[in-house]
């Protein structure tokens, strides 16, 4: 929390090939140790694999996958009188997108395919078809929120 007013949000520059900010955010999520060129190769390689496997525009497939993985609700712990309740809250649009991108990359890394390009492509294609680890994570998050619906009145 800054002492002097709000800090302006820094905008991400769109990526060079697709000219899309969301793809740039995906590349930033893939990046490890500041090695952006490697992250770009992985991302664009995955998009080429998606084009080969589906025959569709990889950007459309990616956007569909992202929409399928974005959570609407999540739970936040709230302490009330010595007990901690998991209170369901709505997810802000920026956080929705950030969580979806993070989950896609995390669950792509856990897959068994040979290269990261193949893993990311497979995870994106699975997410488009409402399958895969990232989609399961979204479903689990929604189930947790649904199970704790009784504590919704503790929202702040």
UniProtKB/Swiss-Prot annotation:
Xref: CDD domains: uS7_Bacteria
GO biological process, one term: translation
Pfam families: Ribosomal_S7 (PF00177)
Keyword Cytoplasm: no
Any single Gene Ontology cellular-component annotation: small ribosomal subunit
Keyword line: Ribonucleoprotein, Ribosomal protein, RNA-binding, rRNA-binding, tRNA-binding
One Gene Ontology term of the molecular function aspect: rRNA binding
HAMAP family to which the protein is assigned, alphabetical: Ribosomal_uS7_B (MF_00480_B)
Function comment: One of the primary rRNA binding proteins, it binds directly to 16S rRNA where it nucleates assembly of the head domain of the 30S subunit. Is located at the subunit interface close to the decoding center, probably blocks exit of the E-site tRNA.
PANTHER family tied to this protein: RIBOSOMAL PROTEIN S7
Family the UniProt entry places it in: Belongs to the universal ribosomal protein uS7 family.
Subunit structure: Part of the 30S ribosomal subunit. Contacts proteins S9 and S11.
Protein name according to UniProt: Small ribosomal subunit protein uS7
């Amino acid at each position: 929390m800054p002492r002097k007013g709000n800090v302006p949000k820094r905008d991400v520059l769109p990526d060079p090939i697709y000219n899309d900010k969301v793809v740039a955010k995906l590349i930033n999520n893939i990046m490890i140790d500041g090695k952006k060129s490697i992250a770009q190769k992985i991302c664009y390689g995955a998009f080429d694999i998606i084009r080969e496997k589906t025959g569709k525009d990889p950007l459309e497939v990616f956007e569909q996958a992202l929409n399928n993985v974005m959570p609407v609700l999540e739970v936040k712990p709230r302490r009330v009188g010595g007990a901690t309740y998991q209170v369901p809250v709505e997810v802000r649009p920026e956080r929705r997108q950030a969580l979806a991108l993070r989950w896609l990359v995390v669950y792509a890394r856990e897959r068994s395919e040979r290269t990261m390009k193949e893993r990311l492509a497979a995870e994106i294609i699975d997410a488009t078809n409402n399958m895969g680890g990232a989609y399961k994570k979204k479903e689990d998050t929604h189930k947790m929120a649904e199970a704790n619906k009784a504590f919704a009145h503790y929202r702040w």
